UniProtKB/Swiss-Prot annotation:
The gene is upp. Its cofactor is Mg(2+). Allosterically activated by GTP. The keyword Transferase applies. HAMAP family: Upp_B (MF_01218_B). This is Uracil phosphoribosyltransferase. The keyword Nucleotide-binding applies.
Length: 209
């Protein structure tokens, strides 16, 4: 599995601010959007270009570069993933949205989809899953499986922080996806929280506890 940890100084600086215990909802939300925007820029750097002809401002036909082939659907994992969508839209404002919601079954401890609203022609699109954190990997693995079952063949993932345990689990389950993250953190604690992590990203984005 392709794993890219973005080392850009602006990404690291902004992520560092997000780790503060005193951060406000407004600031956390803003930084989530800004980092997601920077990560989206990195994800799309590998997209192919093709020449196309348009009528230029001077009244003559000219050749311009345009992204080739596949369109994009952004896939936020509810609810925290919603806070990352605007960062993607800054670069791909026409992206379709496919939403997935997961909950943990208390008996099996496995993630179960409680909501899925996917756009059409997934097999013709790049699916960009967004979720602030990759911890154990359970929800992410289940989301990728759901998308593949619906026809998706090209899946990329953006997270703000990722745990090595989650990366390993995802790589074993879906070695064909690509992961772009602002940080590979140290480990999961005994409660399965990422250390040093960000705390509960969903609560911090939406101002809940």
């Amino acid at each position: 599995m392709k794993v890219v940890e973005i080392s850009h100084p602006m990404v690291k600086h902004k992520l560092g601010l997000m780790r503060a215990a005193s951060i406000s909802t407004q600031e956390f939300r803003r930084l989530t959007k800004e980092i997601t925007s920077l990560l989206t820029y990195e994800v799309t750097a590998g997209f192919e270009l093709e020449k196309t002809e348009i009528l230029g401002w001077q009244g003559e036909n000219i050749e311009i570069d345009q992204i080739k082939g596949k369109k994009l659907t952004v896939v936020p994992i509810l609810r925290a993933g919603l806070g990352m969508m605007d960062g993607v839209f800054e670069h791909v404002p026409a992206a379709k949205v496919s939403m997935v919601g997961m909950y943990r079954d208390e008996k099996t401890a496995k993630p179960v989809a409680y909501f899925a609203k996917l756009c059409d022609k997934l097999d013709e699109r790049v699916a960009l899953i967004v979720d602030p954190m990759l911890a154990t990997g359970g929800s992410m693995i289940a989301t990728v499986s759901l998308l593949k079952k619906a026809g998706s063949k090209d899946i990329k993932i953006i997270t703000l922080v990722s745990a090595p345990e989650g990366i390993d689990a995802l790589a074993k389950a879906h070695p064909d996806v690509e992961l772009y993250t602002a940080s590979i953190d140290s480990h999961l604690n005994d409660k399965k929280y990422i250390i040093p992590g960000l705390g509960d990203a969903g609560d911090k984005i939406f101002g809940t506890k």
